[in-house]
Amino acid sequence: MDPSVTLWQFLLQLLREQGNGHIISWTSRDGGEFKLVDAEEVARLWGLRKNKTNMNYDKLSRALRYYYDKNIIRKVSGQKFVYKFVSYPEVAGCSTEDCPPQPEVSVTSAVAMAPATVHSGPGDNATGKPGTPKGAGMTGQGGLARSSRNEYMRSGLYSTFTIQSLQPQPPLHPRPASVLPNTTPAGVPAPPSGSRSTSPNPLEACLEAEEAGLPLQVILTPPEAPNQKSEELSLNPGFGRPQPPEVKVEGPKEELEVTEVGGFSPEAVKAEQEVSPSEGLLARLPAILTENTAQVCGLSTSTTEITQPQKGRKPRDLELPLSPSLLGGQGPERTPGSGTSSGLQAQGPALTPSLLPTHTLTPVLLTPSSLPPSIHFWSTLSPIAPRSPAKLSFQFPSSGSAQVHIPSISVDGLSTPVVLSPGPQKP
């Protein structure tokens, strides 16, 4: 017998064989009922077939319950060890030549058993249950749905849909790639970034910067075409000028544009070179470009007004800790440079990276003399500080006022404004 035979096929073959009457026998050939005369022996034979030596009737009966839902075998109520073939009512009267094809058809699935009954018998004449046509109908519908799904998967519509969903985005990248090499065949990343910043849609410019910005990093002397591009940037400072505040990333690019226009001094170019860290930060271009376009879109200043404070703003931030008089009375006039520099600083701390140390490194800005006043600052908050003899000898240089006000710029990083008073330190 085939080793892949199922349990109901195994019982059916035992019933067909003549020498197994002492273990299993028919009780009603017309109704398809049979009885397990020796249930443990039948279970042992089934265990030998499946290479399970510990098979018993309890496990066999649980296996037979699986066929209850499949409408193949049913337990006859009120009679012990008596079962009934529901889908094979005339299987007892069939001959040996007609019966073997039935189990072979149903090896794959129990539901596929029903079409085999169509050839063996017209239906259940005893009970009148049309189980065979119902099973055949279910098999036909399942096969129909399965074939339609396979046809859909093989038709190419599924794969074509997913590929076409990605189609609209790639044409955005070859378009600027074809336009940018025309203006600058082997240009620096500055002209591509300038053309992206002048585009009306900043989101599209950010997407173009991710794909088309990196492959064009070839540093060569550009031809006369970048002159026209830099002139367009000088005519449109509203969108073309977000790059100069971002000196940390856009330093090398602006240096090339400044030298092409010719309206800047070499000192300003050197100042931008000192501030810019390296060209390796070009990977952060999309996030910075989006942030600048959202914040500095309304800024309209000339190129000279933006570059000149860039030259002098860095030393002023460094000179602020070295001048004690600034802490005394020049809080609002921290940068006595030009009105444009104060206007740029008024836009917010996120405009220029040079202002970030002002807010994040507050203890560095609170060092006006050789003795660090940060220690003195925190000692005033301590209840033990007035009793310390080391702190009685030092006081803030004041211009006759009883209180020393720290400038608002230097304490923006703190949560609350702090006023230092040398009064509690006097004995």
UniProtKB/Swiss-Prot annotation:
Coiled coil: none annotated. Glycans are attached at residue 380. Residues 348-398 are annotated as: Sufficient for interaction with MAD2L2. Keywords: DNA-binding, Glycoprotein, Isopeptide bond, Nucleus, Phosphoprotein, Transcription, Transcription regulation, Ubl conjugation. Residues 300-310 have a biased composition (Polar residues). One of its GO terms (biological process) is regulation of DNA-templated transcription. Sumoylation represses transcriptional activator activity as it results in recruitment of HDAC2 to target gene promoters which leads to decreased histone acetylation and reduced transactivator activity. It also regulates nuclear retention. There is a cross-link at residues 229, 248, 253 (Glycyl lysine isopeptide (Lys-Gly) (interchain with G-Cter in SUMO)). Pfam families: Ets (PF00178). InterPro entries: Ets_dom, ETS_fam, WH-like_DNA-bd_sf, WH_DNA-bd_sf. Residues 116-146, 166-202, 226-252, 300-350 are annotated as: Disordered. One of its GO terms (cellular component) is neuronal cell body. The keyword Coiled coil does not apply. GO terms for molecular function: chromatin binding; DNA-binding transcription activator activity, RNA polymerase II-specific; DNA-binding transcription factor activity; DNA-binding transcription factor activity, RNA polymerase II-specific; double-stranded DNA binding; mediator complex binding; RNA polymerase II cis-regulatory region sequence-specific DNA binding; RNA polymerase II-specific DNA-binding transcription factor binding. The modification Phosphoserine is found at residues 323, 382, 388, 421. Residues 5-86 bind DNA. PROSITE patterns: ETS_DOMAIN_1, ETS_DOMAIN_2, ETS_DOMAIN_3. It is found in: Nucleus. Interacts in its sumoylated form with PIAS2/PIASX which enhances its transcriptional activator activity. Interacts with MAD2L2; the interaction is direct and promotes phosphorylation by the kinases MAPK8 and/or MAPK9. Interacts with POU1F1. This is ETS domain-containing protein Elk-1. It comes from Rattus norvegicus. The gene is Elk1.
